[in-house]
Design a protein with these regions (language model features):
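Structural signature of the two symmetry-related core transmembrane helices
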Residues: 1-12, 199-213, 294
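Paired small-residue
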Residues: 10, 18-29, 223-231
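Helix-breaking motifs and short loop linkers at transmembrane-helix boundaries and internal kinks
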Residues: 14-18, 218-219
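Helix-loop-helix hairpin linking two adjacent transmembrane segments in secondary transporters
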Residues: 22, 59-106
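Cytoplasmic helix-loop-helix junction between adjacent transmembrane helices
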Residues: 26-63
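Flexible cytoplasmic inter-helical loops of multi-pass small-molecule transporters
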Residues: 103-126
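Helix-to-loop junctions at the C-terminal end of transmembrane segments
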Residues: 183-197, 281
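C-terminal transmembrane helical hairpin of 12-TM major facilitator-type secondary transporters
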Residues: 198-243
């Protein structure tokens, strides 16, 4: 609850900023405390029964990615109506309301861990050092989210330029296609509960690679781009849900620490994907962006091929 309110405070600072330094401060605070959303995932996994844990994780993660994608649509519409500050004013109010809802609805749980904070951080590294499957899944998450960022970072550049020349609001509507793909990935958690996580991962990574063909055709066809967005977001979310369902089985008493390590890797991939995408667009346009996406998708398949035998043991 406290972190949600602090994230809302960061948005208020950004909305009222009169200088670049003030905007950076507000954005940094929002980014720092918005990780509260990731705390809800291991909490939900802890409250769920073993037979439904994957399904529950899938539901929570679908909601998270849905928020990421629909935020683009809503932000575009709000920016058209009242400017960019309106986006942050509205978002801060919604976060404050969410804090109230969490305060009223979250159960009170006691932790069985008696480690201090430095020891907790050290134990995260220890988990990764001693568990090869955890490292494999974290790397898969890193690379899949890099694929996601490669597409979404440069897609706005493509749609704003000729021959499309779309407005901010119109570009934001493409988030609806991604949202549909994210919702379609929800059953992945159920498949993982049934011991089929290796199949969902293999199928998902192959589809991820194939999605870049439609995305490449998107430089001349909006329909092809929408199909590519649907498939890519479906596979990214499906693999992500499967990853989390698998790692939560490994150390049930350390789900928060597993989430901390896994999501750190995940967001590093997202940040790297954004940098790669912007650079590829600058130097080689949409073809360069698609080549970067294909390369990362192939790396994903290589990582999975090398770690596949470890997944069979978990199933």
């Amino acid at each position: 609850v406290s972190m949600t309110l602090l994230a809302a405070g960061g948005m208020l600072i950004t909305a009222s900023s009169q200088s670049l330094s003030m905007m950076i401060l507000g954005t940094a605070l929002t980014g720092l405390f918005s990780v509260v959303a990731q705390i809800l995932v291991p909490l939900a996994a802890t409250l769920a029964t073993p037979a439904t844990r994957g399904k529950v994780v899938g539901t929570i993660m679908s909601g998270l990615l849905l928020g990421i994608l629909l935020a683009r649509t809503v932000a575009g519409l709000l920016a058209n109506l009242g400017g960019w500050r309106t986006v942050f004013w509205v978002a801060s109010a919604l976060m404050a309301l969410m804090a109230v809802a969490l305060w009223r609805g979250l159960p009170k749980l006691k932790s069985d861990t008696h480690l201090n904070y430095p020891q907790l951080l050290g134990s995260v590294f220890s988990l990764f050092i001693h568990d090869k499957l955890l490292r494999t899944r974290a790397l898969l998450g890193c690379l899949t989210f890099a694929n996601f960022s490669i597409l979404w970072t440069s897609m706005a550049f493509l749609l704003a330029a000729p021959p499309f020349s779309y407005s901010e609001g119109m570009i934001g509507l493409f988030g609806l296609a991604g949202a549909a793909g994210a919702l379609g990935a929800r059953p992945a958690g159920g498949f993982a509960d049934k011991g089929k996580s290796h199949l969902t991962t293999t199928f998902g990574l192959l589809l991820l690679l194939l999605s870049w063909l439609a995305i490449w055709l998107g430089h001349t066809s909006v329909l092809a781009l929408i199909i590519g967005i649907l498939v890519l977001d479906l596979t990214v979310q499906g693999v992500h849900i499967t990853n989390q369902t698998v790692i939560y089985r490994l150390h049930p008493d350390a789900r928060n620490r597993l989430t901390a390590g896994y999501m750190t890797s995940y967001f590093i991939g997202g940040a790297a994907g954004s940098l790669i995408s912007a650079s590829a667009w600058q130097h080689a346009g949409w073809a360069g962006v698609c080549l970067a996406g294909v390369t990362v998708a192939l790396l994903n398949l290589l990582v999975w091929w090398r770690g596949f035998h470890r997944q069979e043991a978990v199933n």
